[in-house]
């Protein structure tokens, strides 16, 4: 795997989105990984619908939080519409997937990255954007302005984001708090730092979608 990678430079990352005030980070993280693999496989970068997951993926809890695996499974089973077709409303509503027209993006499966294993995660990110979790509760994270973040934070995670690259000393994470947060909506978080769970628990629960050629 390369020493560093930034999927933004490869055109596989849509502009930073904003989930607020809804607790829908899980949908944004999942969708960003699917936008990424879809671009890698098809050559097209298409902004996809978080709102569809919020409204239609019933195993998660809408604006009260959700999960990486059921949301990925939803897209395996149903596909996901584009952002344009099913735009974000900042709140959970009735599932309108059946009423929507236009193309959908599908994935064929998803895979779990071995937990608390830096090299496995780096190898995964070298291939595509990956859904990861962090502890975002601390003021340092909430009000992060730039640089390589080392904490303070715990490893009890509460927030899903998307790893879209790495360097020698950091992971590059796409957040869903709008472009005015952090480094234009991104955070660089310190790699390894002697904690097997990673800085802010970033190595504890990571998934990526698999997409065949369809």
From Swiss-Prot:
Write down the EC number. Answer: 3.4.22.-
> Which positions are annotated as binding E64?
25
Instruction: Cite the Pfam families for this sequence.
Output: Peptidase_C1
Alphabetically list the UniProt keywords.
Answer: Disulfide bond, Hydrolase, Protease, Secreted, Thiol protease
Q: In which tissues is it expressed?
A: Expressed in latex.
Instruction: Recall the GO molecular function terms of this protein's record.
Output: cysteine-type peptidase activity
Function according to Swiss-Prot or TrEMBL: Cysteine protease.
Q: What is this protein called?
A: Mexicain
| Species name | Jacaratia mexicana (Wild papaya)
């Amino acid at each position: 795997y390369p020493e560093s990678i930034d999927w933004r430079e490869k055109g596989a990352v849509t502009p930073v989105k904003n989930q607020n005030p809804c607790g829908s980070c899980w949908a944004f993280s999942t969708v960003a990984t699917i936008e990424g693999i879809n671009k890698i496989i098809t050559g097209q970068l298409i902004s996809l619908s978080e709102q569809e997951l919020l409204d239609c993926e019933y195993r998660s809890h809408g604006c009260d939080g959700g999960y990486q695996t059921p949301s990925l499974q939803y897209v395996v089973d149903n596909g996901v519409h584009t952002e344009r077709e099913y735009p974000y409303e900042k709140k959970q509503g009735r599932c309108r997937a059946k009423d929507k027209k236009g193309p959908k993006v599908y994935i064929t499966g998803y895979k779990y990255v071995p937990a608390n294993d830096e090299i496995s995660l780096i190898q995964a990110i070298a291939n595509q954007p990956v859904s990861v979790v962090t502890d975002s509760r601390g003021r340092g994270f909430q009000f992060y302005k730039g640089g390589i973040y080392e904490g303070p934070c715990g490893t009890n995670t509460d927030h899903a984001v998307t790893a879209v690259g790495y360097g020698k000393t950091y992971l590059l994470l796409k957040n869903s708090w709008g472009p005015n947060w952090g480094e234009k909506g991104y955070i660089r978080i310190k790699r390894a730092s002697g904690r097997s769970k990673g800085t802010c628990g970033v190595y504890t629960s990571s998934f990526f979608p698999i997409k065949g050629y369809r």
